[in-house]
Design a protein with these regions (language model features):
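Core catalytic region of metal-dependent phosphoesterases/phosphodiesterases
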Residues: 102-119, 133-247
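Active-site metal-binding loops of divalent metal-dependent hydrolases
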Residues: 120-122, 169-171, 221-224, 281-283, ...
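Short, amphipathic alpha-helical "recognition" segments used to contact nucleic acids or chromatin
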Residues: 1-15
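Basic, amphipathic N-terminal segments that precede the first structured/catalytic domain
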Residues: 27-157, 365-367, 378-380
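Conserved beta-sheet core of the metallophosphoesterase superfamily
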Residues: 208, 235-264, 272-377
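Short alpha-helical "recognition helix" segments of helix-turn-helix
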Residues: 19-22
């Protein structure tokens, strides 16, 4: 390639005359003159230019253009990520320090049982005629109060020193599940993230004030999905999971709390000899819907060895209704838990199904490895 053509190409790529002069070992005045002469000769040279040369030049220019666009997009994305991280950090700091919860009085009696709180499908920020973020908080904390009173009733017979909190997913309403969802929420994704995380913190702290030790097992749901189903976003990159992680870190100083991350889409609950699975419910069936018979058959296949971990029961959310179905072995059950939400128009009109808001409370015999008492806790 001649010097004039090279100088013209560098100029086209955005290099200044001084940069070109430095690269070619020339004076700037010589570069200007050389580029001008080359431009004048360009029409004549183009007559002898082959189609392949023109195609190569077009591809080169297109590549340069795309590279510039990618650089700008990357810069914008990095700015957005940094803004999100900064906003989250500032929102967390605004919550203030969270002091450790004083432990309850020890109960040294024998035959202790454990409580299990199945809290699922809060749909944080969902708006219906009877539900919004404020109602969500009221109902969740009402469950905590009722669970405390029921625990006291159980303690009249035996100690209840340990609690497992099973967060079942769809804790946030999200924004990516159906067209028009943006018009059925009262909070942005950012506000959902902060509000639900703080409510999870408050629930765990309430449990720590009642029980000597608390373990959280957390499962994420389909409403926490980021983007559409067609987007190449890993399933575990989920807003529910993000709320759990923030709450977990805010409670990192609680020595009586055990809370691990949840990268898998099915979680395990273990209390002494009691073993159960925690799933959201959209894992079974097509498009997140399955009949009760299909759900139970799925659990039976898992129990027979398809799932590589022996368990007795399965806890399911997702359907916003409270149910219990026996498994084939006559021992285990599939426990389906309701939602804090009420008056869901889609469920009532399209599915002809609706339910009063409720959550689930169990008591577990860790030696016998089974549920000893089951409560449907009404929240309305």
């Amino acid at each position: 390639m001649k010097k004039g053509e090279l100088a013209l190409r560098l100029r086209t790529d955005g290099k200044s005359n001084s940069e070109i002069a430095s690269l070619l070992g020339m004076k700037q005045s010589s570069v200007r003159r050389l580029i001008a002469e080359t431009r004048q000769a360009a029409p004549e040279a183009a007559i002898h230019e082959s189609p392949d040369d023109r195609r190569t030049e077009d591809l080169r220019r297109a590549l340069v253009h795309v590279q510039r666009q990618l650089a700008k997009a990357k810069e914008r994305t990095e700015d957005l990520v940094e803004a999100t991280i900064s906003s989250t950090r500032e929102a967390t700091l605004a919550l203030g320090p969270i002091p450790p919860v004083p432990p309850p009085a020890k109960d040294t009696r024998k035959r202790a049982e454990a409580a299990l709180w199945h809290l699922t499908d809060w749909q944080g920020a969902k708006v219906t005629t009877s539900y919004n973020s404020e109602v969500m908080r009221e109902r969740v904390m009402r469950f905590c109060e009722k669970a405390s009173r029921i625990t006291d009733i159980q303690r009249a017979d035996h100690p209840v020193n340990h609690c497992v909190i099973a967060f079942g997913g769809d804790m946030v309403e999200g924004l990516f599940n159906f067209p028009g969802q943006a018009f059925e929420i009262d909070s942005t994704i950012f506000a959902q993230f902060v509000n639900v995380s703080r409510l999870e913190v408050d629930v765990v702290r309430y449990a720590l004030s009642i029980y000597e030790t608390v373990e959280v097992v957390a499962e994420w749901g389909n409403h926490g999905r980021i983007g559409s189903k067609r987007d190449t976003v890993p399933r575990s990159d989920n807003i529910d999971r993000m709320t759990y992680e923030l709450a977990r870190q805010l409670l990192a100083d609680e020595k009586r709390l055990k809370w691990n991350d949840c990268p898998e889409d099915v979680q395990r609950i273990e209390v002494g000899n009691y073993r159960a699975l925690l799933m959201h419910g959209d894992e079974v069936g097509r498009n997140g819907f399955a009949s009760p018979n299909t759900i139970v058959q799925h659990a039976n296949r898992w129990r027979s060895g398809a799932y590589p971990w022996e368990f007795r029961d399965v806890y399911v959310g997702h359907y916003h209704t409270h149910n219990e179905w026996s498994m084939a072995n006559g021992e285990g059950s599939v426990y389906q838990t309701g939602s804090c939400e009420s008056d869901n128009r889609y469920a009532g009109v399209m599915l002809a199904a609706s339910a009063k808001p409720s959550q689930r409370l169990h008591f577990i015999d860790p030696d016998a490895g089974r549920v000893t008492a089951s409560y449907k806790v009404w929240l309305d």
